[in-house]
Amino acid sequence: MTHAAPSDLDSASAGDLAEAVRTRRVSAVALCDAAIARIERLDEPINAVVVRDFDRAREQARACDARIAEGDTAGALLGVPMTVKESYNVAGLPTTWGIAAFRDFVPTEDAVLVRRLKAAGAILLGKTNVPPSLGDWQSANPVHGVTVNPHDPTRTPGGSSGGGAAALAAGMVPLELGSDIGGSIRVPAHFCGVFGHKPSFDLLPSRGHAPPGTDGAGIDLAVCGPMARRAGDLDLALGVLAGPDGDEANGYRLDLPAPRVPTIDGLRVLLLDTHPSARADAPTREALHLLAGDLVREGARIERSSALLTELAGVHRAYVQMLMTITTYGAPGGREVISAHDWFNLVQRRAKVRREWRALFAAFDVVLAPVFGTAAFPLTDEPVWSKRSLLLDGEPSAFGDQLAWSGMATFAGLPATAAPIAKSPEGLPIGVQIIGAFLHDRTTIALARQIEALRAG
């Protein structure tokens, strides 16, 4: 077995790393040590991996190598070094959700998804930075400080899974476990030029991913999901992470459908580059148009409007009301309260919207849209969203309006994959959001892989 990690593995996919360990081309200890060395060398100016667990990671890696020596090479993520978002419970490590009042909370057991990663052979190096209560498109908090974008340290890496996206973009790790309710996987992936997947609602169990001090109930709209530097690793991780938990596991088994179309040829695409509630700047729209041209040349059928599309402005209003109610619950300093009748009205509206999306996805395989209306914006100390604004094509635009792009998929519980497709005039990554029908997660990830291959070619 090779004990030094070959340099070509520094940028390899998680799947390739697991295969290298499985075939004894490299040891798990060597991969672990190499990843730790990259974090120690690269992370000081970025501040992505804010809770480090290197000693236990090395123990996990040694145990992995010992198991392989005995002939046990099971595990889709065998020996793969990775990180998880700070908000996931890992036994023995603090979980603060970026809130100083929770600084001393140390869980005694792992989140269910952390257990699944470990069972698949992953080596957990530590936890990555988040904003307070996971409620910003930046990743800065009073416990762990500010994370910056590896492409430009004056700009945000996104949030709330911004530390994970920064670690991926800087080449520290190949894989990260994030979460998403307001674009918290997709926006950091877009800002940092990596891949992220927001799964269909409830596809991945959330036990062990809840604010300290709550009873651990699942959070409506919120999902857990993977982020990666290679698109194929999203599918690899999904296979490890997805599936029922607890009592549901007694009666249910997951069987996700295969991608609707195995290649781009014949793919039915609805392209949305405008939204009644949010703007996208010219570089973002141009990147989408160039991608559409590439897909057409590969045989895709692109349409730019459809009578089947749900009424997006109303969806945005309902989503924001539901989101604000959910995300302020349990947070120190108060909450937004609505009546039970108002909540049930939102639930009814969502049921109608889900039916409308179902009808649309009978005519289309995927919807392509911006992840966010611009590339990564400059870091700001202003905590109040209503006092922030973005510059889109030189004109100010309300900051919170950008929730409209992520809310299209989130409100209806649809899968959405973010994939890098271009660079802005400033050299910053621009991504595309690939939205699919409910439980057709493999379709959106498959298109992300095909786009990655097109861009590599």
Predicted features and spans:
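Conserved hydrophobic/aromatic pocket- or pore-lining residues that grip, position, or stack substrates
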Residues: A35, A57, G79, K85, ...
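Short helix-loop capping/hinge segments that flank enzyme active sites or metal/cofactor-binding pockets
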Residues: A5, L77-W97, T263-L272, R301-E303, ...
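Short, well-ordered beta-strand elements within core beta-sheets of diverse protein domains
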Residues: D16-T23, F102-F105, A222-R229, G334-R335, ...
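Structural helix-boundary/capping segments
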Residues: R41, A119, A170-L270, H275, ...
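Acyltransferase
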Residues: A28-D33, R62-D65, A282-S306, W343-F364
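Short glycine/serine-rich loop/turn segments
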Residues: L77-C224, L272-T274, V371-D393
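N-terminal, positively charged, Ser/Thr/Ala/Gly-biased leader segments
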Residues: R25, V29-D33, E40-F102
